[in-house]
Amino acid sequence: MTTFYTVVSWLVILGYWVLIAGVTLRILMKRRAVPSAMAWLLIIYILPLVGIIAYLSVGELHLGKRRAERARAMWPSTAKWLNDLKACKHIFAQENSSVASSLFKLCERRQGIAGVKGNQLQLLTDSDDVMQALIRDIQLARHNIEMVFYIWQPGGMADQVAESLMAAARRGIHCRLMLDSAGSVAFFRSPWAAMMRNAGIEVVEALKVNLMRVFLRRMDLRQHRKMVMIDNYIAYTGSMNMVDPRFFKQDAGVGQWVDLMARMEGPVATAMGIVYSCDWEIETGKRILPPSPDVNIMPFEQASGHTIHTIASGPGFPEDLIHQALLTATYAAREYLIMTTPYFVPSDDLLHAICTAAQRGVDVSIILPRKNDSLLVGWASRAFFSELLAAGVKIYQFEGGLLHTKSVLVDGELSLVGTVNLDMRSLWLNFEITLVIDDTGFGADLAAVQDDYISRSRLLDARLWVKRPLWQRITERLFYFFSPLL
């Protein structure tokens, strides 16, 4: 019996080390950033069982077998649709400004289509204005409405949007609603999901959270887009979830969330529509390719129209494109660069690009919320401040609530707005969307919004920052080490 237990013990020990060696080899064989690989290896060696379980759960990008098969199957038809769209030459911009040229070329070569022109674009910074505009557009819809949000939180004006959407479905408008399972858990636990389905709305719970399948798909891979398309002509996107800030996370101690949304009319709605159709097919298996733009109903040739490129990320979409776009935009800056984000945990490449811009004379400003709803990200962000300040970057800490706007403005002409945070999760993992706008008029509008944020912020003093307590420095470095995993 003693011999039996001895053999079993040695087999367990051998299996234990084989498992660690196997996971180590898997990490080393994956083409990932060195800091990320080192962080995972350290966790596995310090807390082997916890580290191995964590890595197998969230260490690699698993979309799930069924969704991955759908993603592969949809691309032939999607590629054909994009190729057919190129025949609509009147919607594509032939030239771009000098500051935007490189970025638009990158997007065209990676995604297969050029930026689209002739769009009307409006910035909305007040949640009530967003909701009211959306309700009006829903009430005037004639054919179809598609929506996707990370969070839909019942309460306040979000309920009025829900009522208007159900009314549209009852009068024959084809309505589709896709919501992230984790972000919209309150919605799916409320009566609203059943009420909408009973009204005729197709409601899809995207990327369902299921602990039984934790090793088959990454549970932290989320549908983070916020998009609305109406009649293939009107579109919305930006940082705002379908929530009323007066009711959302009031106990978090960070104040009301401050967001920005863009309302558009024109062919950009078609470009966003193909992104939605891909998401819908990956999640449901149903193909809903949007129609090509109709020149008879869309004012493409208006002189005041904006040129917009749509960048989508996530499994099944061009890998690393949003990260490349941010790097390209940063290196294109010659005069000034302003960034706003609630979560700042940049890649080494992006951090160096930002610092280099400041060191070559560009006026670089980053606006972050002073109080953050994520303790981990809040501390990790602070670990980058010293390097940024030393390079000459101005860091503004917003004090008017949780600044949730994601925006980049380069030289007053090139703008990026959308759902992408400047953190690892948005850059490498989630389903995200960003608009790239080449227009001085829109740049002036965005600059006014960012100036308002700065007026409600406190400029971080580099001299005081270096005098912060030792315990804060230690905490920052601890979270900085794990920043590649956040």
Curated annotation (Swiss-Prot):
Record key words, sorted? Cell inner membrane, Cell membrane, Lipid biosynthesis, Lipid metabolism, Membrane, Phospholipid biosynthesis, Phospholipid metabolism, Repeat, Transferase, Transmembrane, Transmembrane helix
User: What CDD domains does UniProt report for this protein, alphabetically?
Assistant: PLDc_EcCLS_like_1, PLDc_EcCLS_like_2
Q: Which reaction does it catalyse?
A: 2 a 1,2-diacyl-sn-glycero-3-phospho-(1'-sn-glycerol) = a cardiolipin + glycerol
GO molecular function per UniProt: cardiolipin synthase activity
Q: Where is the PLD phosphodiesterase domain?
A: 219-246, 399-426
Give the E.C. number(s): 2.7.8.-
Question: Kind of enzyme, top EC level?
Answer: transferase
Please give the Gene3D superfamilies that the UniProt record associates with this protein.
Answer: Endonuclease Chain A (3.30.870.10)
Q: Which domain of life is it from?
A: Bacteria
What topology in the membrane does the UniProt record assign? Multi-pass membrane protein
Q: Which residues form the active site?
A: 224, 226, 231, 404, 406, 411
Might you report a single GO cellular component term? plasma membrane
Which protein family is it in? Belongs to the phospholipase D family. Cardiolipin synthase subfamily. ClsA sub-subfamily.
Q: Provide the protein name.
A: Cardiolipin synthase A
Q: Which organism is it from?
A: Salmonella arizonae (strain ATCC BAA-731 / CDC346-86 / RSK2980)
